């Protein structure tokens, strides 16, 4: 008996049109697959179809005996230009058989090998272009690969040179083709009646077809005017006869097929190369192996035809790229007769449209493993590719209607990738870039830009002093390498580099860069990845970085991989200093990356300027540790480099007031931030309880998320604090000022900005004053009594300043006779940083929206002020109203802190307070999957809060519904209502009480997630260790070791303070 095929809720007459994203429909199909599983049914304006998304079902419908290629949707619209060309012809059309038989030999092995010189010629033109533009040039790989592949198909198949690399802009054919394919996609999902009245759109559509057709006609006319004996594809179409029927192709069909090859012969290959470059840059180990293979096979010699077969790893890179991102991500078939698929589980009627969701099916964990979403070319090597189940890898389609030009595209791609890797290293223009898609008939990366750095002395990490190691984007986003103010002398270069996910290391790096000018240095600020391939040697390198569960920050991964791959001592001309940030709760990996960088630099010949510094974010002396290290650094650097130190703390920063004004600047200072919109903001807790809020946002266009990811928010300071500063310095909120700086600065330099906007959005006002800040105030003119008080504060800094969280502003208000200038005050303040909050929703609920579950910090001021202390970001969020715009960015959490791909995997969740956020997202996803008919694994949630009446978040809504649905078992711990939680006060108490309920979950493959404070995480670890000790009869040491072994890859934490 067959099973019912699930279908999403629909709208009368429209069906599921509203469920499909307009710009990138593929994202919607992927999310529907995650929710409904391997098969689901859609109704698009009355056109019904089945979507299959598993390797098994993809294989079942890849059967020429029982299924035929379906010409519908966007592909049907493409026929408006290419008619019965090979790609779009119906199987029963005579011209398809004639063209297929005629042209198959043209793509045989011998013919493709003969095209090698022309392919190399054009790949060399691309290399030459990137060499001449140099490493500072921002490259759009998709655009240049389109030039390459279009020119290649035209030259190799038609002996026609388009000379795209000698044009300032793309060939007119390209833009017309792109617009045409986009409109084909839109027409497929638009009512025909609506299309018929879109006069301007239709006129543009016809004009695009005309532009493409004119090029095809010109190529044919050129060949007829100048015949050749070359047996290229064009000559075969013009002069050959079908061996079976004796017929020739008609002039119309020749044009149709010429257009087909111009479109299909270049668009997928340019996408393949663009995706491959993206995956290599994002996976430094794969990039290193690719360079090693190219160096071993090619050396410094030009690639030869015989080299192609030796480039096994390059071949694996392309295969893995096409697995993860097949440029034709979906195809459709129909059965000749009624049939069942999935071992008889699903019934498919005759001629019913079946959409093969290739991009999802090729990530099926049953074939590719739990890491199927990750890029690992090794899975295509050593016989693994050949051992795959039938039809598991199908980026070129299947059977008789598979891509005829696959051998052509593959040879072209191997040549191009090999010669580019032989010549260049590549870095992202925006180090934080994550893959975005643009979709027409095919897909490509969107907004993807890189820099090509010439490889010298392979493997090379050093650059000459004159080299420009930083990408232009890095300079934009960090204000690095700002020119000195007029009249300032040239200074000794220094390079301040950071690896930071949360912004702390970046903030410390910015502080060092801010202080450089006063010490005679011209600082350049950038990410570690921005110098991954070329470290400058004409000045000191100062590194501030962190570890994230033992791994480098996102903008330092490439640097770490490149550094650790060096051999011998190539860094003897380099001088460096390293400060590491970390948190002692991650004791196994504490300071791992800072230690690794520091030691490896020394091992490879670099000279350490000062001992590595350590800052523990879990310690009350975190900022003091950095300050002590920074003080030592500034003692050493001027002496080592013979620079002049100025005593004026305002050196390098000037503030000019320019009169009143009303214009407020909007400055997106986080490179990946864009504007989202507040949809809802409501309180979750009872009156009198510490406030927690549920906030819903509309994401910026094109931004996607996963359950477990973070939403980074760029906040503003509480208005009460801003007004305190204005009052202290006697300024009006509307006062317009202009800032100039002789060094890199995160402040808005060189333009007018109001004092209120500056203080609201660019600096941190409430961070505790550092000991250095207090010493600075001590050196400013004030009364003797004030100086004595400041000295006393310094002597007991930890208790008197840090313990009371006294900010610079608090001190200035407490001692009003300190004559500190406003510019000097700004120079002391750290730059505003983003705050990351765990997303508390799943994209299966709404792909365009996310929710946050936030604790609002409002507590008595430890400084003694009457007004309460307000958390900067939480106060900002609490005061948002629907419709407000917010600067935000989705940032991936640790790879382990995501749901397992198989929804049947059990979950054990531990959370307290707003730490429930990611768990809510996980459970929401599981609930939606279960409602869609999928089998989901058991989930147990241990949640800590005060009481069921005060702050048991979502207990009367989502959690109640999901418990009733059978998605989750709720096991709360109420710290102020123990009688309502089995006498358990904290999460770990409830875990111990209910420990028998967890029997068998580990053996069933459960994943364990913790989100909350360090105290919560430690408590959970201790109780789980105690459970191991009890069940196994282990000693404390044995139980602790067993916990460490058992949790590898199965236990993920997200700790916040």
From Swiss-Prot:
Gene3D superfamilies: 3.40.50.360, Cytochrome P450, NADPH-cytochrome p450 Reductase, Chain A, domain 3, Nucleotide-binding domain of ferredoxin-NADP reductase (FNR) module, Translation factors. FMN binds at residues 500-504, 578-610. The keyword Iron applies. It is an enzyme of class 1 (oxidoreductase). Residues 465-488 are annotated as: Disordered. One of its GO terms (cellular component) is cytosol. This is Self-sufficient cytochrome P450 monooxygenase CYP505E3. The lineage of its organism: Eukaryota, Fungi, Dikarya, Basidiomycota, Agaricomycotina.
